[in-house]
Amino acid sequence: HPRSSAASDVYKRQGLGGSGIGGKIATQIVADQLKIPAVINNDYTMPKFINENTLVIVSSFSGNTEETLEALKVAQKANSEIACITHGGKLAEIAKENDYNLLILPKAFSPRAMLTYSVIQQLYLFNHYGFVNNDYVEQTKATVALLDKEVEDIISTAKQTARALQNKTFVTYSESSMEGVIVRFKQQINENSKALGWAHVFPEMNHNELVGWAGGKEEYAVIIFRSSYEHPRSSVRIDICKDIFKKHTSTVLEFNAKGDSFLAQTFYHILLGDWISVYLAELYKVDDVEVEVINFLKAELAKI
């Protein structure tokens, strides 16, 4: 459908888990172009400010995510401009019934395996609604070529990193513009490797979490994802804090992204992080696909 003239004030993105992180990453890729507020929503509810001038992109791989479908009702009641990204399920049915813009994801084992589709489709929607240009098209092609060239080195680095993370609690950091990358990395370690850890960003962590490093231990492994797009002062902060971390743990790893665009550097880190999680799963001898505890939770919720 053509762009609605109503969708001009706020961009609102609804989704959770593997279907939700794509919104965060896509928004950060085009942050330098967006001239409207962009809000990522991961809940049952929607902010009170949404109205007929709000574009709401609703994403759920299965199309049956409970929280997303509940939030969609709020957007419908507000008469917002709605676009949907899904493989099927109830979300696809609702989109077709209401003639919403609908992008269909191909079948896959899990939502987290569809991240690239999710990000690119959202960039397409940003462009379709007139919020960004189409530079992402050529940047995506260049990124594919880059990753094809670098994949063997990325895999080698991932194997070494997985060994360094084994039997440790991981802590991952980046500058705020790369927050989507480290949240994705944390999620992949959680789901694929069945391990716990946390993620935080510079400069915010300097105002709270840094003090917590007084209780840092050797059992912590720090992974820092760097980008040439960092704010210069954040880069200085990271360099100083590396030395602070090293006073408490010998495992402080730093990765510099390759690529000529923010999009390329983003996916370089995502690919590296994904491979780390897979090889860590191998070391832990766990199934990197299995998420039975999530299925159990959904089954229990369905009883209530």
Model segments located where?
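C-terminal active-site/capping subdomain that shapes the small-molecule cofactor and substrate pocket
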Residues: 211-292
